[in-house]
Design a protein with these regions (language model features):
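An N-terminal RHG(E/S)-centered segment typical of histidine phosphatases
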Residues: 1-43, 56-60, 84, 178-216
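Amphipathic, non-transmembrane alpha-helical scaffold segments
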Residues: 24, 28, 113-121
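Phosphate-coordination/substrate-recognition cap region in phosphate-metabolizing enzymes
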Residues: 32-98
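Acidic, low-complexity terminal tails and accessory targeting/binding regions
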Residues: 76-88, 129-134, 150-216
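Short glycine/proline- and acidic residue-enriched helix-loop micro-motifs
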Residues: 94-115, 205-215
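Generic beta-sheet signal
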Residues: 134-140
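GST superfamily/GST-like fold recognition
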Residues: 142-146, 180
Length: 216
């Protein structure tokens, strides 16, 4: 699943460090709804990236579980926004995940999609190779989830950006000799995704755009 909603704006209106943000009140409600969804599921393992927003989500969804931190599943790392030309900022946000995203594409001027695959696929292989578990909950990020879902569907290092991952959404996959993708993007608080027509990156840009003069 993806972590619950966060705000990437600090109290002063400047972009907050994406490595430090925690869940908003809405994000906590999304995590609580996911907890109810998983109430009847026996989870053998619960893992998250090492960032606060996934760890906080995991602790709400599975309060009795020991949370494993897997740094390889951290979110795509962008560059400093001040390093992106002002006339390219909007496009970098709203078109970050559009169509089949090339491996050489940089996320907000930082890490490439190929570099994302370089770290998440070995971690995935390590998880799958461990036969001691039957059901694992992985609380990750939108970029990770798109990469893993696309890999499960195609078996290739392909990144389908249009696999939207709303905050707090759940994906259901079976893995054995092959991958089976059973469900994608289940949002317990908004099953039909009627609360917004914006993608996650469009929503982030909408929040940041009024403060673009503070990004430099």
């Amino acid at each position: 699943m993806r972590h619950g909603a966060v705000s990437y704006l600090g109290p002063d209106g400047r972009p907050a460090s994406p490595d430090e943000v925690g869940l908003t009140e809405v994000g906590r409600r999304q995590a609580e709804a996911a907890r109810d969804l998983f109430a009847a599921v026996d989870l053998d393992r619960v893992l998250a990236s090492n960032l606060p927003r996934t760890l906080e989500t995991a602790r709400i969804v599975a309060p009795d579980a020991e949370i494993e931190e897997w740094p390889a599943f951290r979110e795509l790392r962008g560059d400093r926004l001040a390093g992106i030309p002002e006339d390219e900022l909007e496009d970098e946000f709203v078109h970050a995940f559009r169509g089949v995203v090339p491996n050489e594409k940089r996320f907000l001027g930082g890490e490439t999609i190929g570099e994302l695959f370089d770290r998440v696929l070995p971690a995935l292989d390590r998880l799958v190779a461990d036969r001691s578990w039957d059901t694992t909950l992985a609380v990750l990020h939108g970029g990770d989830n798109r990469a893993l879902l696309t890999y499960a569907l195609t078996g290739e290092r392909m990144f389908l950006g249009h696999l939207e991952q709303a905050p707090g959404c759940v994906n259901v996959l079976d893995v054995g000799d092959d991958w089976i993708v059973r469900a994608v993007g289940i949002a317990p608080l908004d099953l039909l995704h009627g609360s917004t027509r914006l993608t996650t990156m469009e929503a982030i840009w909408q929040d940041l755009e009024p403060y673009r003069d503070r990004m430099t």
